[in-house]
Amino acid sequence: MSESKSGPEYASFFAVMGASAAMVFSALGAAYGTAKSGTGIAAMSVMRPEQIMKSIIPVVMAGIIAIYGLVVAVLIANSLNDDISLYKSFLQLGAGLSVGLSGLAAGFAIGIVGDAGVRGTAQQPRLFVGMILILIFAEVLGLYGLIVALILSTK
């Protein structure tokens, strides 16, 4: 096995896995959040069809999680080259896992809170502000992963 001047031939594999992890895990979280809160919207809209547009917020917030993963995956993919060092590729893997797994967790939280919040808001409209605050805290979990990933990938 030959080594280039910067690292072994297989070094780029870890960077590619970081880009893949960023996109796959954040998209899984976004898909779960969208599906879970979407079923709550569908159930709520039977009783209160006038609240459909107001209740779409959890679905939008879940979709933003996938954008975080896309941003990091594109940054990692753009930094790939033939002579990437093993150190740099492990940083890229860490960045991808950071944003991906935090996006997965945030997507799950947004889906569960969005589903329960939308159904509860249909019964008691005063719950809307509380639901939005909890959704913001869930979204911030994904944002923390994005910040760490940006720091790691630009090192």
UniProtKB/Swiss-Prot annotation:
It is found in: Cytoplasmic vesicle, Clathrin-coated vesicle membrane; Cytoplasmic vesicle, Secretory vesicle, Synaptic vesicle membrane. GO terms for biological process: endosomal lumen acidification; Golgi lumen acidification; intracellular pH reduction; lysosomal lumen acidification; positive regulation of Wnt signaling pathway; proton transmembrane transport; regulation of macroautophagy; synaptic vesicle lumen acidification. Signal peptide: none annotated. Changing residue 150 to F: In EPEO3; likely pathogenic; sligthly decreased function in proton transmembrane transport. It is a multi-pass membrane protein. GO terms for molecular function: proton-transporting ATP synthase activity, rotational mechanism; proton-transporting ATPase activity, rotational mechanism; ubiquitin protein ligase binding. V-ATPase is a heteromultimeric enzyme made up of two complexes: the ATP-hydrolytic V1 complex and the proton translocation V0 complex. The V1 complex consists of three catalytic AB heterodimers that form a heterohexamer, three peripheral stalks each consisting of EG heterodimers, one central rotor including subunits D and F, and the regulatory subunits C and H. The proton translocation complex V0 consists of the proton transport subunit a, a ring of proteolipid subunits c9c'', rotary subunit d, subunits e and f, and the accessory subunits ATP6AP1/Ac45 and ATP6AP2/PRR. This is V-type proton ATPase 16 kDa proteolipid subunit c. It comes from Homo sapiens (Human).
